[in-house]
Each structure stands twice: as C-alpha cells, then as structure tokens.
Amino acid sequence: MKYFKDIPEVKYEGPQSDNPFAFKYYNPDEIIDGKPLKDHLRFAIAYWHTFCATGSDPFGQPTIVRPWDKFSNRMDNAKARVEAAFEFFELLDVPFFCFHDRDIAPEGENLKESNKNLDEIVSLIKEYLKTSKTKVLWGTANLFSHPRYVHGAATSCNADVFAYAAAQVKKALEVTKELGGENYVFWGGREGYETLLNTDMGLELDNLARFLHMAVEYAKEIGFDGQFLIEPKPKEPTKHQYDFDSAHVYGFLKKYDLDKYFKLNIEVNHATLAGHDFHHELRFARINNMLGSIDANMGDLLLGWDTDQFPTDVRLTTLAMYEVIKAGGFDKGGLNFDAKVRRGSFELEDLVIGHIAGMDAFAKGFKIAYKLVKDGVFDKFIDERYKSYKEGIGAKIVSGEANFKMLEEYALSLDKIENKSGKQELLEMILNKYMFSE
C-alpha cells in the first residue's frame, strides 16, 4: 500500500524553488570538505513522533489519524507502520531512523509476550533493511510510559521494577544489534524524584550506575560495539531528573567510572528546559570529548515544557553545526529529528514538510558554520583575547608553575590593570554577516 502516494519524491531544487516538497538548501550529494553533505549531517527520522503520534494532549483528544493505524489489531497496526516508515524514508532519502522498543511493537500482557511481539516486528524490519538505503542510527527502551515505571526504572524503589527494566534493556540491546544500530540511548524520563521527602537519592544514583554498568557488560557479552549515549533532560515528566544537563551527566559518569563508555545525545529543547542555550550544551560536551549525537528540534522560549518543534531557526542550527565541525564531525552519531508536527498540522503532507524544513535549516546552518570555522572568525578573536596566558605570568599559570606567593608578588608589582572590550556586539554582527551572505 502506498501511504504517501499523493506526495512526490523529495529532491533538491535550490533556494529559488517555491515547491514545498523540495529541498532548498539540502543537496545530499553536494561535496563539502571532501565528503557529501548527507554524510556530514547524518539525518535520522524519529519513529515515535513520525509514525506513532496522535496529536493528543492533556487537554484534548487525538487530532491525527494516520492511514496505517486503521486496524483493530495492534500488531497489524505495527506492521503497517513499518511499511509506512520505509516508504517515508525513501520519500525523503534519509540515511537513518531511531526507535524505542515500544514504538515498533506493542507492549504485551507480560515480558514474554512483549518480546514475542518485538521479535515479529524486528524480523519484518530486517526484511525492509535488505533493500533500503536507510539504517538504524540508534535504538532504546521505553522505560517511562508503562505504569510499572511510576517511581522510575533503574532508580525505582521497587527491586522488581529494576529487574524488569534490566530485562527490557537487555532485549532492546539485542534488537538494536540485530538491526545494525550504531548507537544505544538511555533517557531517564522517570529517573529522578517528585519530592525528597520519600527519596533515597544516594541509593537511586548508585543503582542507576549499577544498571548502566550491567548494560555495558552485556553489550560486551553480545558483541554490540555501538556507542552508548545518555540524553540529558532536567525535568518533564519528572520534577527533577538525574540527567539534568550535560554537566550533571558528565559528573555522574566520572564519579561512577562510566565516562569511557558513554557520550551525550543532546536535544535542543532539553537544553532550553535546563536554562541553557543549545550552543552551551554542545560546547560543554565538545570540550570534554563527550559529544556523541543530537536530537534535532527546538522549543518555544515562552513555554515551560518540551514542545519538540521542527528546527527552523538557522542561527540555532549554525551554532550547533559550528560545534559539531569543531568536534571533528559526527562519528557514529547524527541529527535525529525528535520533532513532531503541531496538533493542528494533522495532514500527511505536514509530516513531510516539517522534515524538509528541518533538513534545510541544518543544511544551511552547516554551510554557514563550515565557512565560519574555515575562516577562523571566532578562533582568531578568542586567541587574541586570551593571549596573556601564552607568555609571562599567564604562561606560568597555565603550566602549573605559578603559586599564590608568586602571583601575589606579581600583583604587587602591577601599577594598574587594563581590560579590553569583549566585543560581543561586533561578533554578533559578524555572525549575522555570514548568515545573511551565505
């Protein structure tokens, strides 16, 4: 069955095109710095938002009814989603997709039935993968939707829940490996607390670390060589989540000797909820060699929740790709569109248009960022700004030679201290120049 039969295959037509079903800036085969643009960006489709979302919210019923959800049997719907998904991947010519275990196959009455459902759908996906150019960027387990996870999964107060979550991740790891996934993601939506009055934070954090170490060991056991990723988010659905932001996760991984196994999967809207620019989260991850992958979306700064909008802000995408390029590009990671159409955008074509808009925005951002990096615009300014640490007393501070007594003696010899302007306005002007002239 053709679900998108009324929508033409999406091709690159250039910035002058008015065709809503064409790329304006994303030319997948355009060679930049020796490789195609598609290999720089490594776009992925999020299975959950794209094929499972219904448009429901806490105040209203579903507004989105997809043609692949027409069956009364949940497994029939799951099989239809697979067919629709691979048609969609081909329509946009995307290289990757991402999934939760419960996105692709429904939860059963017990773990055995859930695993049976998963095996059946995985077998079907494997058949499609044989002839598809699209691969799996990452897989994960949904450890937040079912009521059993009301108090968390790895951080649950109930050891039975911990055990069930471990079994679910075990299976999800096996499935991700079976499908050729390049990464495996942990997102702790229920790993946190609502109140400290009933919480043993120390035990919960220790148990979370134990859980992750078990995952690392099992991955070695089955020969899964994909990259483990943790996705920070400060809140929602839980009041306080332990993977609050990049710095929190980095500190946690360091404390529990997990940093050698994990990198970060950073989402735009999660950075917003943590009170950070996306640029900040990426910069922190990059300078600590923790930048693994990106969940590409954006939020509404006037709202206090995760809106998961398609990323259309070119300044945001430019600064994001600047950090990715400075990090040496993606290794096993990529740009996963963890984005959903608005509740009022319920037509099938809106799904396609949303992804085109996001892919164009990141393609444009990459091209601008590449030129900024190549020209050394910000690097030159930063080198000049911090040059006092390359000679004299500054060099001694950096080398570790300086101590308080030496620095006091030096400070006493100073007549006066002169600072120079940070030139923020100039740098923002230059950024705009590159954005508008590219």
From Swiss-Prot:
Gene3D superfamilies (alphabetical): Divalent-metal-dependent TIM barrel enzymes
Cofactor: binding comment: Binds 2 magnesium ions per subunit.
Keyword Zinc: no
Residues the entry annotates as binding Mg(2+): D306, D308
Localization: Cytoplasm
Keyword annotations from UniProtKB, A to Z: Carbohydrate metabolism, Cytoplasm, Isomerase, Magnesium, Metal-binding, Xylose metabolism
Cofactor list: Mg(2+)
Cross-referenced SUPFAM superfamilies: Xylose isomerase-like (SSF51658)
Chief place where the protein resides: cytoplasm
Presence of keyword Coiled coil: no
PROSITE patterns found in the cross-reference section: XYLOSE_ISOMERASE
EC number per UniProt: 5.3.1.5
Biological-process GO terms, alphabetical: D-xylose metabolic process
Record's GO cellular component terms: cytoplasm
Gene Ontology MF terms in the entry: magnesium ion binding; xylose isomerase activity
Catalyzed reactions per annotation: alpha-D-xylose = alpha-D-xylulofuranose
Enzyme class: isomerase
PANTHER family per UniProt: PTHR48408, XYLOSE ISOMERASE
Assembly description: Homotetramer.
Family: Belongs to the xylose isomerase family.
Protein name: Xylose isomerase
Naturally occurring in which organism (per UniProt): Caldicellulosiruptor bescii (strain ATCC BAA-1888 / DSM 6725 / KCTC 15123 / Z-1320)
